[in-house]
Amino acid sequence: MLRIIIFIILNFYNPALTSMKEDIISKMQITNNLSFNFTHTIDEKSENGMCILEYPKKIYCEYDGANKKIIVSNGRSLVIKTNNGNNYYIYPLDRTPLEYILDKEYLISKIKMLEPRSIDNKYLNFQIFENNNEINIFFDKKSLNLVGWQTEDIYQNLSVTFISSIRINQKIDQKKFKLPQNN
């Protein structure tokens, strides 16, 4: 019986992961915004670009490529705008997984309750289930930076976002989060 208890303690309680989790929470608490490059993949189709994320719930992303898509959230609504024809689509933010990903306090509260999973000895993953959304959040084990997330989009497609060239607490022009107007 003692062997079983020792086995459970050694295999399921990892103080190093617990310490990293606490360090991730501390780093998130002092982070007001992130600027980063990204690769966003849905059903094997990838797009690249750059984003500015400001807590709580604001994001501005410019996609590379022919249509120069822009995604903006002002904290309440999410707008996807394409430059070909100046069409845009508006969604209530609370109907998307970004409602949770862009909410630092929500993420911190969930991370406090979850045990991280180590992936390839490079990343820590926290798996969150909320309102029929499965959200996987990934942090780099060395830098403890947020490096991506995985969700399902509104059409039930697997959506994976990897982020790189991360800059923390940069000066941000608040006009970036103004929702685009139809021309």
Residue ranges and their predicted role:
Residues 6, 40, 57, 63-67, ...:
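A mature extracytoplasmic/lumenal domain signature
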Residues 51-100, 159:
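An acidic-aromatic
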Residues 84-123:
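Flexible, surface-exposed loop/linker segments and immediately adjacent secondary-structure boundaries
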Residues 109-183:
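Gly/Pro-enriched, hydrophobic low-complexity segments
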Residues 30, 53-58, 73-77, 120-121, ...:
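Short, solvent-exposed coil/turn segments at beta-strand boundaries
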Residues 4-12:
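Sec-dependent N-terminal signal peptides
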Residues 26-46:
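A short, Trp-centered hydrophobic/proline-enriched beta-strand micro-motif
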Residues 16-18:
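Boundary at the C-terminal end of the N-terminal hydrophobic targeting segment
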